[in-house]
């Protein structure tokens, strides 16, 4: 019987929304050194691969970026398209969203769970929580969902090593999302512990 990951990959491969953006994911993954499978898991959770998705809070597109966040990471309106229209374009949304995710992974090194929590709730929320996952059920469920998908999609270590190109260092992700919170932090709090020390757990419901 196929594994859960294999079944999930098979579902993705027949989903038109996914098939049409695979090349954008691959390019962004390589440019920002973010695992392809992490982008798959995050986008599946955020938008279900619907490039036209708009949240009640105003987040747009595949990676559900808030316009303010997109502006921080290089997206600008022009005479032809508004910022929101640009974010509905996978060629704009995926690179910008991946740049933001890369920033968060660097902000919380070795803590993918905190990076994902920050993607959902905002980095300020994570910092105010003492560099722990904020006590928002939605954020805790988001982190749990993205990580579960990621671990199903990620190939086993021997397969992963076989897929990696010679000489390429693949990022080792260490597992770790309040309603569209990818906004600028309103408070910057210094990291209070070593970045590789476990700071939080996600309670099971």
Regions found by a protein language model. Name each.
Residues 1-12, 23-26, 156-205:
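An acidic, Gly/Ser/Thr/Pro-rich helix-cap/linker signature
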Residues 2-166:
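Catalytic glycan-binding domains that act on GlcNAc-containing polysaccharides
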């Amino acid at each position: 019987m196929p594994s859960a990951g294999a079944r999930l990959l098979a579902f993705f491969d027949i989903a038109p929304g996914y098939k049409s953006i695979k090349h954008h994911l691959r390019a962004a993954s390589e440019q920002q050194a973010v695992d392809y499978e992490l982008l798959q898991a995050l986008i599946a959770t955020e938008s279900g691969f619907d490039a036209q998705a708009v949240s009640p809070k105003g987040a747009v597109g595949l990676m559900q970026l808030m316009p303010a966040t997109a502006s921080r990471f290089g997206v600008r309106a022009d005479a032809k398209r508004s910022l929101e229209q640009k974010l509905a374009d996978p060629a704009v949304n995926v690179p910008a969203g991946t740049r933001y995710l890369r920033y968060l992974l660097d902000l919380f090194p070795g803590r993918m769970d905190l990076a994902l929590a920050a993607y959902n709730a905002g980095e300020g929320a994570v910092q105010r929580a003492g560099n722990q996952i904020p006590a928002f059920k939605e954020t805790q469920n988001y982190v749990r969902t993205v990580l579960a998908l990621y671990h199903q999609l990620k190939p086993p270590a021997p397969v992963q090593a076989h897929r990696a190109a010679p000489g390429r260092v693949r990022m080792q992700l260490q597992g770790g999302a309040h309603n569209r919170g990818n906004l600028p932090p309103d408070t910057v709090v210094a990291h209070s512990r070593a970045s590789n020390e476990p700071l939080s757990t996600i309670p099971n419901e």
